[in-house]
Amino acid sequence: MDMKDFLNVLASKEPVPGGGGACGYVAAVGMALGNMVLSLTTGKKKYAEYQEEIEELIVKAGDITNRLCECMDKDAKAFKPLSEAYGLPKDTEEQLEHRNKVMENALLIASEAPLSMMELIVEAIKLIDRISVIGSRLAISDAGVGVQMCKAALNGASLNVYINTKLMKNIDVAEDMNTKADELVITGNELADKIYDRVMDCVHP
């Protein structure tokens, strides 16, 4: 699916892609921007001391970008059981009990997908942190744009965790997932803001 088709489906009534797929896409673009900075830096005499590290980071950034794209598919697949669970009958006690059991499992699956995405986005932000230090100053603004996209995707993915855990009956599991999401939000946002400030110091007149 090309970008235009993706956006058309995203804007439609189709259940997927939704916010999760959008977050994965935005984060992948952000990581790709970071990788672009590396590509513009590699081979430059001025940054020769970092050449070996840059080559390693290009591979890592490419891997994270690919995995974020995979997260888009995983998020869509994770939402399907939840979508089906909402349609289960609940007219009798037995039906209601079955529906609640299926719903609880579906909510868990639907929460795990964005949580995994958040972990990967924080990896991307950490990588851009290093890129913003050793990357070409001529392309440093792109590292700033990339990290802002990753930050937005991280916060967006957290909402997809919380909206599902809020409905879970197993409070212990829900609280554990919320705690993990909270920590990722704090870690990712603090580092993203630090990177943004570093970039601003380089580009602002």
Where are these regions (language model features)?
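Conserved phosphate/anionic-ligand binding catalytic regions in large, soluble enzymes, centered on
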Residues: 12-33, 139-157
